Amino acid sequence: MKDNPTIVVRGGACPNAGHTVVDGDKIYKIRMLPSGFLNKNAKVLIGPGVVVNPEVLLKEIKEFGASGRAFVDRHCGIIEEKHIQRDSSGDLKEKIGSTGSGTGPANADRAMRTLKLAKDIPSLSKFIVDVPHLIHLALESNENVLVEGTQGTFLSLWHGTYPYVTSKEVTASGICADVGLGPTNVDEVIVVFKSYVTRVGTGPMDNELEPEDISERGWSEFGTVTGRPRRASDFNFELAKRAISLNSATQIAITKLDIRFPDCAGKTSFEELNNDAKSFIKNIEDTLKIPVTIIGTGPDKDAIIDRRK
């Protein structure tokens, strides 16, 4: 919000990744639109590398007040009922822990060149644009563009804990490719870490905590899309180092500091944090050699410490 981008564009897998945005007494659970939709001055775009569930997208545009500024690239792939059915049974569901959204089977059909595209769907006709073209027009006018990804680095099809991964590449380079943005046009890469590690479904997790320990620490969470309880472990510096390397990160954002340090809830300046929280942030910076510039201290969009100059 502070950076006032004229475009907020989503790359990544979709709609198997859910994001929760809180604005006062309103809670938005998002699967298709980028979280930056709250910025009323920004166009909200979905890049051509993203697969789209038209029903979910149209519902979000209507319910979240994004009509007239939400658009979809003509080359976005389309999730159909057959993809959801394939995703909700068999090994994908039972062994990999798929969310059942149809994302994986749709991406598989895209690789086989049989997937329908957004430009072929009548209900999306008034939302169809050329997303890369709009992005580059904005950049030529020296406007800010915010590119938002989905999932996490270690759910990447190439770099993650295969086979317990999502169906495509979700590191920064993959997200940029999804929206048609070349590497020389990227100014900053902000890698987002929770103050502890979570994972939904199956797959490896170092130093995983028992459910009782998770509850005792107050770290209990449930997936936005599936509602399944999230597994948890303490902050993992080795994973963080690897994520920074794979994403060429220039800044770190830490979320849920208030869950780890409840006294920090709602704070908006670093000086207000208690000593334990300050030491936690300093240890991250000293160990990872990257500045922590954004700190989330609560679910509301305004519960943020922004340390950028």
Feature locations, PLM:
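Non-transmembrane, aqueous-exposed alpha-helical and coiled segments at domain scale
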Residues: 1-309
